[in-house]
Swiss-Prot record:
Domain of life: Eukaryota
UniProt-listed Gene3D superfamilies: BRCT domain (3.40.50.10190)
Single Gene Ontology MF annotation: ribonucleoprotein complex binding
Binding partners and assembly: Component of the NOP7 complex, composed of ERB1, NOP7 and YTM1. The complex is held together by ERB1, which interacts with NOP7 via its N-terminal domain and with YTM1 via a high-affinity interaction between the seven-bladed beta-propeller domains of the 2 proteins. The NOP7 complex associates with the 66S pre-ribosome.
Subcellular location: Nucleus, Nucleolus; Nucleus, Nucleoplasm
Protein name, as recorded: Pescadillo homolog
Chain coiled-coil ranges: 512-588
Keyword Transcription: no
Any one cellular-component term (Gene Ontology): PeBoW complex
Bias (Basic and acidic residues): 510-519, 576-588
UniProt cross-references to InterPro entries, sorted A to Z: BRCT_dom, BRCT_dom_sf, PES
Function: Component of the NOP7 complex, which is required for maturation of the 25S and 5.8S ribosomal RNAs and formation of the 60S ribosome.
Length: 588
């Protein structure tokens, strides 16, 4: 029997430390991190760290040995090594003062692509759509950052371009389903091929970038996510018969920028335009065509009129056909044509034209209104645009964020921006009188609910329902009393007879009543103890892991209930203070 060597099986074999992985791949730590981000490999936590680290208890980062073996065959790894040698040659040339050779080296520097990694990690398109939440969050974050020494202007410009392409597609296809304005920014949710995609767009405020952020890792993620989104957008645009990348109207981009500057053309129109350009005749060919046409006309005039069929056909062409009108008054047989849009939210504002005030953020509202089928006129853009072609008589709603408006136009509905958000979340048009300028707005709640399960609107409805049930039960009990008066009288007669019999025997009726109440209490206690015993038995039958999970679940549920109760108490206090204030205002 051979003696088994130590640290050759189990955790010691399955796991590799980070320093061992870097040594095995022969790359720097920074390149190793980049490679792991590109390939989606992350650190693992072994069950027994001491065994995995071969007896050492020093804090280390572990990876699967198979993952590191998988990285050894990556083509990007060779590109990293080539870049390392290129950097050495470049520093040597610059140190010697050989500028021409340094320029040649810089021109021939190696570059790599992440296309094959995207195809490996996302074999199907739905897999890629499910994973673009983080990609969108990262790109919108960098699009909002100012250009610094760590983040160049090209990076922010490219990120902004990809974000606008995404928003332009979502707005054109009308895919937005939910929106929530929070302290961090605006959360959007869109339905892309049956998958719910949620992302965060920060507010366009001046950013103070902290100094303790490692931008190298963030830029690596940005590089991967931008490649992923290019793939996704190309697929979405081509499937919708649109040209990718979309063209930008330079004149509008200088004035307004945003979604209105993007021109989304279909590929069929593009092909027709290119075909017409290619088939434009030259001067010589046009002369030949005119000569041949003249000869053909002369030949037609000299032809003998001997064919009667031609005459008939000519007469048939000039005859006007009778118009048949549908006299059927019953329109029930006509089938309603299905809409090209799946959700009713897509056509929510299709009949409206919105005039957005200069104090309202146009980028948020323009995206939402266009996604719901509406039209937008921005007051901020009118200063730079010619207002001759704009028809202001078609404006149905004006969005303002001011407490008082001096001049109002007749025929327009004046609303605050929250009306757009609440209509979209509820998938219907809510009453506009609650959102008039200067009015106290209803609470803007998250459409995805609270983590603790608290919903103020639902709780109010439930409380009202409980009150109604109590009233119904009281009414029902009153009716039952009226119906069963005779039965109650019979019961009273029986009780009186029992009392007389017991008094004759020398026993008090009150003592018997007390014993009946005690027996009922005992039965209740017995039932509760039985239920507790059943719970204890179930707990005994559980494994240690299940028991711990059950205790954690009970603790979390108790915390949630406590939080909900506190919120309800706060709500009651706020409603009481509001009632007091209204009473005081009424007295004044």
């Amino acid at each position: 029997m051979r003696i088994k060597k130590k640290n050759t099986s189990g955790n010691a074999k399955n796991f590799v430390t980070r320093s061992q992985a870097v040594r095995k791949l022969q790359v720097s730590l920074a390149d190793f991190r980049r490679l792991c981000i590109f390939k989606g490999i992350y650190p693992r936590e072994p069950r027994n760290k001491k065994k995995a680290n071969k007896g050492s208890t020093a804090p280390t980062t572990f990876y699967y040995a198979k993952d590191i073996q998988y990285l050894m065959h990556e083509p990007v790894l060779n590109k990293f090594r080539e870049h390392k040698t290129f950097a050495k040659k470049l520093t040597r040339a610059l140190g010697r003062g050989e500028v021409s050779s340094a320029k040649k080296l810089d021109e021939n520097r190696t570059s790599y692509k992440l296309d094959h990694i995207i195809k490996e990690r996302y074999p199907s398109f739905p897999d890629a759509v499910r994973d673009i939440d983080d990609a969108l969050n990262m790109l919108f974050l960098f699009a909002n950052l100012p250009a610094t020494d760590q983040v160049s202007s090209k990076i922010t410009k490219d990120a902004n371009e990809i974000c606008n392409q995404w928003l332009a597609y979502v707005a054109r296809e009308r895919l937005v389903r939910k929106v929530f304005v929070s302290i961090k920014g605006v959360y959007y949710q869109a339905s892309i091929r049956g998958e719910d995609v949620r992302w965060l767009v920060p507010f366009k405020f001046p950013e103070n970038i902290p100094s303790d952020i490692d931008f190298r890792i963030m830029l690596t993620f940005l590089e991967f996510y931008s490649t992923l989104l290019h793939f996704v957008l190309y697929k979405l645009y081509t499937d919708s018969d649109l040209v990718y990348p979309p063209k930008v109207d330079i004149a509008k981009n200088k004035i307004i920028s945003g979604l209105s500057s993007y021109i989304l053309e279909s590929e069929t129109e593009e092909n027709v335009l290119t075909a017409t350009k290619l088939s434009e005749p030259t001067g010589e060919t046009s002369n030949i065509d005119s000569e041949t046409l003249k000869l053909a006309m002369k030949a037609d005039e000299n032809v003998d009129d001997t064919n009667p069929e031609d005459e008939q056909t000519e007469n048939v062409e000039t005859v006007e056909l009778d118009a048949f009108q549908d006299n059927n008054k019953n329109k029930g047989d006509i089938l309603a044509q299905p809409s090209q849009y799946e959700s009713p939210v897509s056509t929510l504002f299709s009949d409206f034209v919105f005039y957005v005030g200069r104090e309202v953020p146009i980028d948020i509202l323009e995206f939402l209104i266009l996604s719901c089928g509406g039209s937008v006129i921005s007051e901020a853009a009118l200063d730079k645009l010619e207002t001759k072609d704009i028809d202001f008589s078609k404006v149905t709603h004006q969005i303002v964020d001011r407490p008082v408006l001096k001049n109002k136009v007749a025929g327009r509905t004046y609303i605050q921006p929250q009306w757009i958000f609440d209509c979209l979340n509820k998938a219907k048009l809510v009453p506009a009188n609650l959102y008039l300028p200067g009015e106290t707005l209803p609470p803007h709640l998250s459409p995805w609910g609270d983590a603790s399960g608290y919903d103020p609107n639902v709780s109010d409805a439930e409380e009202e329902g409980e009150d109604d049930e109590d009233e119904d039960s009281e009414e029902g009990s009153g009716a039952e009393v009226e119906e069963n008066v005779d039965e109650d009288e019979d019961d009273e007669e029986l009780r009186a007879q029992k009392e007389l019999e017991l008094e004759a025997q020398g026993v008090k009726y009150s003592d018997i009543k007390d014993t009946e109440v005690k027996s009922k209490n005992k039965k209740r206690k017995a039932a509760s103890t039985e239920a507790e015993e059943e719970k204890d038995l179930k707990m005994i039958m559980m494994s240690n892991k299940q028991r711990k999970l059950y205790k954690k679940m009970k603790y979390s549920n108790a915390k949630k209930e406590e939080k909900v109760e506190n919120l309800k108490k706060k709500k009651k206090q706020i409603s009481k203070t509001k009632e007091k204030l209204t009473k005081l205002e009424g007295k004044k």
